[in-house]
């Protein structure tokens, strides 16, 4: 018998990686503002409560809009993003074993559309970029399910599917995964970027292949 019924994943740093360990927001802010200092400043403002998550998204996307960003420019900027080794095989094997799969992430939909267009996920919670008929960026629908909201998303999926929360698992890597890791019945810190996540997760898994999580999901 499976120990869990649902496994949800973060994306940036968990399923998708960059050679310099950048996430998609850092890449696009640097591309369209010419500097990476805005990332650190807004992150600090968010963590200190000076801005909300929705305001953080609006500020970043506002800069991209001011720069006249287009779909093709965004795709060119993120071309160095790659799937973590073993993603396709691992997800396929988890499905074969009967697990429901989901994404709960602060990433952008264009990342999944580009790198995992035929993904196996039953539920996908992330930020959605909006383009006009000429493929110019016109806005973004900010997910209400990042950081603390990730735990709420997990509860919503579990309730809808009739799955007890203790039979839900989560795999992530960063500060915004801490609360959902606490909420889940089982959590894995995959190549964690912060000590707090390592401390709250049931197990830490390190390596370049997602298949390393499979022994924990028989």
Model region roles, listed by residue range:
Residues 88-96, 150-151, 155-162, 182:
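Surface-exposed amphipathic alpha-helices with a cationic face
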Residues 113-168:
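Substrate-recognition "cap/lid" segment bordering the active-site pocket of phosphatases
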Residues 68-81, 138-145:
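Glycine-rich phosphate-binding "P-loop"
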Residues 1-51, 58-62:
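Active-site neighborhood of HAD-like aspartate-dependent phosphohydrolases
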Residues 125, 203-208, 212:
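Short acidic-hydrophobic, aromatic-tinged amphipathic segments that line or gate anion-handling sites
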Residues 24-27, 86, 110-114, 179-180, ...:
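Phosphate- and divalent-cation-binding pockets in alpha/beta enzyme and binding domains
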Residues 105, 165-207:
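Acidic, Mg2+-coordinating phosphoryl-transfer loop and its flanking beta/alpha structural elements
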Residues 72-110:
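Short, acidic loop-to-helix structural element flanking the phosphoryl-transfer center
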